[in-house]
Regions:
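Gram-positive cell-envelope targeting signals
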Residues: 1-61
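Solvent-exposed, low-complexity, repeat-rich "mucin-like" stalks and linkers
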Residues: 54-59, 63-105, 160-183
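Surface-exposed, short loops/turns at beta-strand junctions within beta-sandwich domains
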Residues: 125-133, 207-213
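Cationic-aromatic interfacial patches
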Residues: 146-236
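Surface-exposed, glycine-biased beta-strand/turn segments
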Residues: 232-341
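Zn2+-dependent peptidoglycan hydrolase active-site motif and core
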Residues: 311-312, 326-361, 389-394
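Short, well-structured beta-strand-loop connectors
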Residues: 323-333, 364-380
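Conserved, short, structured surface segments that act as functional micro-motifs
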Residues: 343-348, 369-417
Length: 418
């Protein structure tokens, strides 16, 4: 009995200890999970703050969506992506890139050289001047898109127009050719000579004032390419002038054998000179302001002589000593006194295009000197075959004198594709 009582006491003590241990374990577990919950809550709160902060920052610094740019070129539509390049080959000017985005600016590069810069609308009129590889860069301020274009155009003729009045000059150019030379044949009195330039070959075709109006064939050979063209010569009316000049003056000039021989010996050979470089740019200047007393091409009868002569330029009346400007940049072929035309300057502007200045009182330039457009080359006078102070101003393509007002009003550019 005593033993049984001791066993029950031991068991009760064991159970009590077991319950106490379990309670402690439960308390410990509760403490652990409370701590874990607290820690996790802090992490969740921290994560929630970070996500909120990221959302706020993202909304304040959001960038525009990258969208493809549709560019039409070479008969295809290219969907360009920023920082990626596409490439195509254009065999016709009509196949050059086109984009219908008014807010885009465009730059075109040949290597590192900028060939074009403008709007997408202005790009419509741009044609690369020669075959090669061009980088078209489109930008809207946020993204840039690039299209590489290899131009492989067939040889083409460019000119301002196919019709010309008597006394005009037609600028011609052949582009997109690798020909080593370009030649021409025509039934006109002048056979055009072509000169090499960076983007092809160029030439000036003058129409002599005594050409019969009508249509004239013009054949141009550029390597294996042959171009059959038609030049239409239109008529113009030339006024008639009856001029009276002191017989002493005529005897010393136009009727003087020595004066004519001097001209033929010194000046005539200079007409054939053609520098293979274009010195001028844009329109030419009227070299002096003054009243026009005689127009280009006027049919002149002197002192009742039944044989007429043609006036090669325009006469501009001005006071003696009035400065005379160079009509364009060029090289002085002659600056000196001639019995026939007095103090005279002849300037070569390139490709055979020349300007002439007669009857000056004094000269301010020398032979072989380069002059700039607008530079003073002399002063108005009345030397040589002259009836009073004026400047005789003329222009020619080699031996063919042309209307100088065309050079002043329009200039000579190498025209549009035909």
């Amino acid at each position: 009995m005593k033993k049984d009582l001791q066993k029950k006491k031991k068991r009760a003590t064991f159970l009590l200890k077991r319950r106490s241990g379990l309670k402690a374990a439960i308390c410990l577990a509760g403490t652990f999970f409370s701590a874990l919950f607290f820690f996790s809550g802090c992490q969740m709160e921290q994560q929630s703050f970070t996500a909120s902060e990221q959302t706020e920052n993202s909304s304040s610094t959001s960038e525009p969506m990258q969208e493809p740019l549709a560019v039409t070129a070479a008969g295809e539509v290219f969907l360009l992506l920023p920082d990626q390049e596409a490439a195509c080959t254009a065999t016709l000017p009509e196949a050059l890139p086109h984009v219908e985005k008014d807010d885009f600016s465009v730059q075109v590069f040949e290597g590192e050289t900028l060939a074009f810069s403008g709007t997408a609308a202005q790009l419509e009129t741009f044609v690369p001047p020669q075959n090669g590889l061009y980088r078209y860069s489109f930008s809207n301020g946020n993204f840039s898109y690039t299209l590489m274009v290899e131009t492989a155009f067939a040889p083409q003729i460019f000119w301002q127009e196919s019709e010309a009045l008597l006394g005009e000059a037609l600028p011609l150019s052949v582009r997109y050719t690798d020909a080593q030379s370009v030649t021409a044949e025509t039934s006109l009195s002048f056979q055009p000579v072509f000169y090499p330039v960076d983007d092809g070959w160029v030439s000036l075709l003058p129409i002599h004032w005594n050409t019969t109006p009508g249509e004239y064939p013009l054949t141009i050979y550029a390597g294996t390419s042959v171009f059959e063209l038609t030049v239409t010569v239109a008529d113009r009316t030339f006024e008639i002038q009856n001029l009276t000049v002191d017989e002493t003056t005529t005897a010393q000039t136009v009727e003087n054998d020595e004066a004519n021989a001097e001209w033929n010996q010194i000046i005539e050979p200079l007409k054939a000179i053609s520098d293979s470089e274009q010195y001028w740019s844009g329109c030419f200047l009227q070299p002096v302001e003054g009243e026009i007393t005689t127009q280009y091409g006027m049919i002149r009868y002197v002192n009742g002589n039944p044989t007429s002569v043609r006036h090669s330029g325009v006469d501009l009346a001005a006071d003696t000593g009035t400065p005379v400007q160079a009509a364009g940049k060029g090289r002085v072929l002659f600056a000196g006194y001639l019995q026939l035309t007095g103090n005279t300057v002849l300037i070569e502007h390139g490709y055979g295009l020349k300007s002439w200045y007669y009857h000056m009182d004094s000269l301010d330039v020398l032979t072989d000197q380069m002059v700039e457009q607008g530079q003073i080359i002399g002063k108005v006078g009345s030397t040589g075959f002259s009836t009073g102070p004026h400047l005789h101003f003329a222009m020619s393509v080699n031996r063919v004198f042309i209307n100088p007002w065309t050079a002043i009003d329009k200039g000579f550019s190498w025209g549009n594709r035909r």
